Amino acid sequence: MPLNRYYMAQKQTIQFEIAYQEVDMNNRLRLYTLEEHLLNTAGKVADSLGFGTQALRPYNCAWIITRMMLEMDYMPTQGEHICIETWVEQNAHMLSTRNYRIYLHTAAEDRLIGRAKSVWAILDINKREIVNMFDHPMFAGAVDGEVLDITRSPRMLPVTEPDVESTHTVRYSDVDYNRHCNSCKYLQIMMDTCLPSFLSECSADSGKQAIRLDINYQKEVYLGDTVTVLCKQTENDIQYTVKTVTGQASCSAKITKL
């Protein structure tokens, strides 16, 4: 049973220093590395409060992310510090909604530079099926947390007429403990496929270009699987679809200039 009914709604903050290998050609934090920090924060906080993957492992279960919406007003540079605050907003319909606020941390202040919302489910690692979190007593009676005001993701249609197309075979370094391609690896694979000028523009101009990421995880792929990455660019956004060899969408994403 949870320590108290408010344990999932509790806010906790973790600080990160932006390392040299985490920035791009404009010295701005890469988007997929920011996603890694968000997911690592979620994992550490959930473990510390007793409902993370460590608590689920005896049941052969683990948390998996199904969707994320992220808005950034500023992308930090190497050596700068960010603080990521996170909490669970709601558990409903076998899904858990987790929110984040991202702050640029200095000696003078913590300035809000971004916000994100993610949706999670619990995966039975052996059966490869989503399970009802409320079957686990640790989630009984948990109270909802603060609602984060961020626009819902638009419906993303598959890319059918790509500007760029590539293939990728899932490698050892792509696969995580859940035995599938890691969620952050999808974004890296997609961003490596696109036209680099768009991403360079997003991180140029002193990082002042506000951007939004919408990403949906739809179907697992595993070690040795080959996927096709389709990329379509307009003036203000770039959209991706990752397809399996059978033509099913494995992941869809959109990066938009705000």
PLM region spans:
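Aromatic side chains
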Residues: 20, 100-103, 172, 186, ...
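Structured core of small recognition/catalytic domains
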Residues: 180-258
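Hot-dog-fold acyl-thioester-processing enzymes
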Residues: 3-65, 113-117, 121-209
